Amino acid sequence: MRLIPLQTSEQVSRWAARHIVERINRFQPTADRPFVLGLPTGGTPLQTYKELIRLYQAGEVSFQHVVTFNMDEYVGLPKEHPQSYHTFMYRNFFDHIDIQPQNINILNGNTEDHDAECRRYEEKIKSYGKIHLFMGGVGVDGHIAFNEPASSLGSRTRIKTLTEDTLIANSRFFDNDITKVPKYALTVGVATLLDAEEVMLLITGYNKALALQACVEGSVNHMWTVSALQLHKRGIVVCDEPATQELKVKTVKYFTQLETQAIQSVL
């Protein structure tokens, strides 16, 4: 696993966006051979999306032959709802780049048959061979996508009940009213994420420090699903200084020395 310890969340966003652009451009996607990108929602990736839009507008990347798969979507929330992940993605990213609408894939949380929708999503991913790069964030309790604590590390796309911690955290998007937050979501599984060729997690802020510690220094266990990244051949964690507060000093120093070139690229 690579850990890239930066100073600020802005540096994290810049590094992540540039890494995505480099991967797309190196791949040289075409209509018959698209680059497949996994994407998250939430507050952490917002600046990364803004930076990707800036790089697109500067002519440094095209998303015309990029296929995207989002991590998750609430159950029962209309697509047009201001807090649906459909709305989030179009408002904060898709409406500002040259991605083709047919290349956008987001789970349908309003379908009558959730199991069938989850199977369809898995098959759609498989139809492209694999996701080349999956970017994600992490919850305070270490969940990735909506794979809450005690989720199976071998899980696939499915419906999940959201924990009280997640409902409280997400209530900030629903007028701070926990009763307005959907109780269920469709989400890719931990194994779905690990199937990607590369997984890049963005971890920022003091409140994510325990999650980062579990990811980097802890044992692999289902109570901290982020720890499953240790099993991946090409896992990357990009973090800011506040998120490192629970890591051992020698751990931070080790990766700081190891990733000197990556760190200097955003200074």
Swiss-Prot record:
Biological process according to GO: carbohydrate metabolic process; glucosamine catabolic process; N-acetylglucosamine catabolic process; N-acetylneuraminate catabolic process
Q: Which GO terms describe its molecular function?
A: glucosamine-6-phosphate deaminase activity; identical protein binding
- Tell me the route in metabolism or biology where this protein functions: Amino-sugar metabolism; N-acetylneuraminate degradation; D-fructose 6-phosphate from N-acetylneuraminate: step 5/5
Q: What is its EC number?
A: 3.5.99.6
Which residue positions are annotated as catalytic?
D72 (proton acceptor), D141 (for ring-opening step), H143 (proton acceptor), E148 (for ring-opening step)
- First-level EC class: hydrolase
PANTHER family associated with the record? GLUCOSAMINE-6-PHOSPHATE ISOMERASE
Which HAMAP family does the entry mention?
A: GlcN6P_deamin (MF_01241)
Annotated Gene Ontology cellular components are: cytoplasm
Q: What is this protein called?
A: Glucosamine-6-phosphate deaminase
Name the UniProt key words of this record, in alphabetical order: Allosteric enzyme, Carbohydrate metabolism, Hydrolase
Q: Which InterPro entries match?
A: Glc/Gal-6P_isomerase, Glucosamine6P_isomerase, Glucosamine6P_isomerase_CS, NagB/RpiA_transferase-like
The catalysed reaction is: alpha-D-glucosamine 6-phosphate + H2O = beta-D-fructose 6-phosphate + NH4(+)
Q: So what family is this one in?
A: Belongs to the glucosamine/galactosamine-6-phosphate isomerase family. NagB subfamily.
